């Protein structure tokens, strides 16, 4: 999700100009008090916005989906099944940092890591209770997967997170239904699946898998059996993938890495 334009310098522009106006208005007491009131209102509004706006860091976990008897996890694969490096992403569709990774970083990851065969990425649901509409979003994406369209729906959900999240609406389904049409789904079949909450156990199993792996915030990534928390940059992820690929690609001779021949002069 693109960052909000809430830089202190932007918020302070009207405040500073109002102060200058007030200082020059000593001969106009009515104007002075009007401007003073405006300053107070601007300050209150700015503080309120800072207090309620989504934070950019990882979102702490609170268990949501039912993980009882959930069975084995089943994520959503992108890339080759036999890719040398496996990236497991545990994310929440309503998590701002997850949207940031999807919109800002993941396009490069896909074209320069996944599409080139260096690694695969598998998405696992990790819904959080403080996000009111996230289970519904996971359900919408799972039903899109039934028609082979998980990733287009995944992308659309993150791109449009601002309009369907729990702070924006109590009824996300109309938005999801529109996205289903936009990504080319049979909307009637998708809606039947969505209304039945057909994949709730799958979502719960994915959450349970993350908990077993020690995931406690979103987004989190498991790469080479190591857990990384927070929104990763492309460069950081590429370095990890390259390191794992290098450590596993050396040929073995009698169980030991083969000697690397040196150039002769």
Report each predicted region and the residues it spans:
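Short leucine-rich amphipathic alpha-helices used at interfaces
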Residues: 21, 54-55, 167-168
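A short beta-strand-turn-helix
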Residues: 68-85, 113
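Ser/Thr/Pro/Gly-rich low-complexity linker/stalk segments immediately outside membranes or between
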Residues: 54-67
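C-terminal cap of thioredoxin/glutaredoxin-like
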Residues: 2-51, 106, 177-265
């Amino acid at each position: 999700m693109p960052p909000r334009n809430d830089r202190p310098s932007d918020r302070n522009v009207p405040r500073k100009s109002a102060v200058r106006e007030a200082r020059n208005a000593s001969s106009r007491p009515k104007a002075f008090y009007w401007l003073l009131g405006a300053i107070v209102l601007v300050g209150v509004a700015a503080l309120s916005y800072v207090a309620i706006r989504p934070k950019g860091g990882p979102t702490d976990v609170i268990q949501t989906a039912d993980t009882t008897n959930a069975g084995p996890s089943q994520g959503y694969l992108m890339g080759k099944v036999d890719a040398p490096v496996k990236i497991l992403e545990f994310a929440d569709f309503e998590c701002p940092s997850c949207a940031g990774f999807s919109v800002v970083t993941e396009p490069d990851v896909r074209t320069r890591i996944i599409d080139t065969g260096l690694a695969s990425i598998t998405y696992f649901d990790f819904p959080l209770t403080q996000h009111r509409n996230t289970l519904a979003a996971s359900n919408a994406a799972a039903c899109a997967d039934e028609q082979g369209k998980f990733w287009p729906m995944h992308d659309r959900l993150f791109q449009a997170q601002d309009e369907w999240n729990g702070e924006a609406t109590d009824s996300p389904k109309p938005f999801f239904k529109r996205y289903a049409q936009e990504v080319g789904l049979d909307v009637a079949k998708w809606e039947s699946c969505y209304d039945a909450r057909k994949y709730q156990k799958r979502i719960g199993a994915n959450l349970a898998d993350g908990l077993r792996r020690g995931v406690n915030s979103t987004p989190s990534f498991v790469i080479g059996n190591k857990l990384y928390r927070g929104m990763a940059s492309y460069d950081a992820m590429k370095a990890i993938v390259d390191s794992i690929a290098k450590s596993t690609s050396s040929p073995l001779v009698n169980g030991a890495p083969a000697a690397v021949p040196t150039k002769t002069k």
